[in-house]
Amino acid sequence: MRALTLLLLGALGFGAKAGEIDQAAALKLLQQPETVLIDVRTADEFAEGALPGAVRIETPDLARHIGALAPAKDTPIVVYCRSGRRSSAAQDVLEGLGYSRVVNAGAYETLAPAFSPD
């Protein structure tokens, strides 16, 4: 019984698992000014439109560049891409590097309306 209680408390405390898209958590995290927003799409995709404040770093380059953006491992980080697949891989990379507050926001097109002035 104790193990079940701990399991349930853990599920409540940690939200989405690595790789899972959690746009609600991402939008909430983006209300915090210290949150780093990373777009892992290609340069061409980014040029077609990006979320305000997003920094473009493709997933293979994350390990090389993340330290400059987020030196503290508890920095909140939100990642997104075109469909959610690359942002899932990016979340895995960041968590593998020790970042503890990474949220996969999924697809740009489903996030963009939350940032429109309408």
Name each model-derived stretch.
Residues 2-35, 44-76, 85-118:
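Rhodanese-like catalytic fold shared by cysteine-dependent sulfurtransferases
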Residues 37-39:
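Structural scaffold elements adjacent to functional motifs in cytosolic proteins
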Residues 79-81:
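Metallo-beta-lactamase
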